[in-house]
């Protein structure tokens, strides 16, 4: 429903290899930059002007040359940030459901890739699969 009501939105994604290469924080910033780029493309397609100010949840991104504000606990204070968080979570959950079919035995459909007991049991039983982050697994294995 959020997507249908929004004037525009953008989704940015990076894979596990990028996260392993540049770390989770930098990968998050990269994905957020991609999301802003997609947002601006969608706005342009809709005939709207580009984004001129961005609110982020507890983060600033130097690569984005648009005025921005970091809002601590932004998803609890700003409706647009909360909506973006929901879009991100639903998108990730759908991707993990697809991975559950592709890589059975890790309970991705339930744990969404988070470090749950069932997920760790799947790793111990089957080893890692191509979507696992090696940097995270160093802490676990």
Task: Locate predicted features.
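RNase H-like, Mg2+-dependent phosphodiesterase core
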Residues: 1-141
């Amino acid at each position: 429903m959020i997507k249908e009501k929004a004037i525009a939105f953008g989704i940015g994604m990076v894979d596990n290899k990028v996260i392993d290469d540049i770390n989770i924080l930098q990968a998050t910033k990269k994905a957020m930059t991609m999301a802003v780029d997609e947002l601006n493309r969608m706005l342009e397609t809709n005939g709207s002007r580009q984004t001129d100010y961005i609110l982020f949840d507890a983060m600033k991104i130097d690569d984005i040359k648009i005025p921005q504000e970091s809002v601590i606990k932004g998803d609890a204070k700003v409706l647009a940030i909360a909506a973006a968080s929901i879009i991100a979570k639903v998108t990730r959950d759908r991707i993990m459901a697809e991975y559950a079919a592709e890589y059975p035995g890790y309970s991705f459909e339930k744990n969404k890739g988070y470090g749950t007991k069932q997920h760790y049991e799947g790793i111990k039983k089957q080893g890692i699969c191509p979507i696992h982050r090696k940097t995270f697994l160093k802490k676990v294995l």
